[in-house]
């Protein structure tokens, strides 16, 4: 494939899409009119009220026999991951969680219309792990990283044990390294065939948060800013965003700007924001407002295209997994673990069927 076939270009030279199924999907959304974007959102019933207390939506609010029946049609489960963190005077400390839960609820609604509803489960980290610079900030509750990892591994194991062996964790908080560590620890410890994925949803559709392009946000995605507040205005119930209380604040950098990128890697800089500490003040001292950016310029319309993009991308993720591994099947045990197929056979049976064994009966492995 030549260079001209590798990339799908746009009217902005800094924004290109890879010529793959994913890239072509993103390019399609990029080229859509505002009316077409509204039609995508309508497919997913965006916006809608939160469904956490609505029967037959989350695993935890669906009666058991329905959970099992649905899993036999679609055994992918998506979980939102967030935190409790000060997001300024104008919005809520659960913003990261609610962004993710509203997104995955939309994916569930759309797949349910197709008769193959993806499973969704409650947020396993409602308080969250945090980077060092969050310490001491009122309104932010920090869980130690090792506790968060262990908690996530336990959730992964419990879901796997119940037949949910394809898991996707959608994150909107500065803790991706903790989620990645949990994935690897789960596989170290249990060595079972599974597909477990984590992603920062905003980074997954980063092109749609580039500042100053295509009627989108005008400032880089950071924290409680124009980007996050716009998403909240589109997705959240009335009263969870109050622009009249919005404040503007920015981080003081000790080093020249250009090395460390923002939350969505908008500038293609050499390093992610999370790859250093100490080169800027901690939040309590540097941005006590709980904001990095200019949330007062937020509008729900600015979030429509990125939300359409993540909804369609997550649907594609589910489709790709199930196309390769239909419900009840997993990757080849002897290719993705050091256990034998015979050893794992009882553990891979339908839970509670004759001969089935629980994941907790497996001989422990790991480092």
Which positions does each model-derived feature cover?
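Extended, histidine- and acidic-residue-enriched regions that form the cofactor-binding/catalytic faces
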Residues: 1-143, 150-166, 172-367
């Amino acid at each position: 494939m030549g260079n001209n076939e590798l990339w799908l270009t746009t009217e902005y030279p800094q924004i290109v899409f890879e010529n793959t199924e994913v890239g072509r999907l993103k390019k399609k959304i990029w080229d859509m009119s505002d009316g077409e974007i509204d039609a995508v959102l309508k497919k997913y019933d965006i916006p809608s009220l939160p469904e956490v207390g609505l029967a037959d939506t989350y695993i935890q609010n669906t009666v058991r026999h329905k959970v099992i029946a649905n899993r036999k049609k679609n055994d992918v489960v998506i979980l939102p991951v967030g935190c409790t963190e000060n997001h300024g005077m104008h919005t809520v400390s659960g913003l990261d969680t609610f962004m993710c839960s509203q997104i995955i609820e939309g994916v569930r609604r759309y797949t349910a219309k197709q008769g193959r509803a993806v499973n969704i489960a409650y947020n396993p980290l409602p308080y969250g792990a945090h980077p060092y610079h969050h310490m001491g900030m009122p309104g932010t509750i920090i869980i130690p990283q090792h506790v968060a990892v262990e908690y996530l591994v336990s959730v992964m194991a419990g879901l796997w044990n119940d037949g949910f062996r394809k898991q996707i964790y959608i994150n909107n908080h500065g803790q991706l390294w903790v989620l990645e560590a949990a994935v690897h620890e789960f596989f170290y410890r249990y060595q079972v065939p599974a597909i477990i994925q984590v992603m920062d949803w905003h980074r997954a559709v980063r092109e749609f948060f580039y500042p100053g392009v295509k009627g989108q946000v005008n400032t880089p995605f950071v924290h409680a800013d124009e980007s996050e507040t716009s998403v909240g205005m589109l997705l959240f119930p009335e009263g969870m965003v109050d622009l009249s209380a919005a404040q503007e604040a920015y981080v003081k950098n000790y080093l020249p700007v250009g090395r460390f990128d923002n939350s969505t890697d908008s500038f293609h800089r050499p390093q992610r924001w999370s790859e250093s500490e100490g080169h800027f003040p901690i939040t309590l001292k540097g941005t006590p407002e709980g904001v990095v950016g200019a949330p007062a310029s937020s509008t729900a319309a600015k979030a429509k295209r990125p939300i359409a993009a993540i909804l369609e991308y997550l649907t594609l993720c589910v489709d790709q997994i199930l196309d390769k591994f239909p419900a009840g099947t997993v990757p080849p045990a002897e290719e993705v673990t050091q256990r034998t197929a015979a050893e794992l056979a009882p553990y891979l049976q339908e839970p509670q069927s004759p001969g089935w064994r629980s994941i907790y009966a497996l001989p422990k492995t790991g480092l």
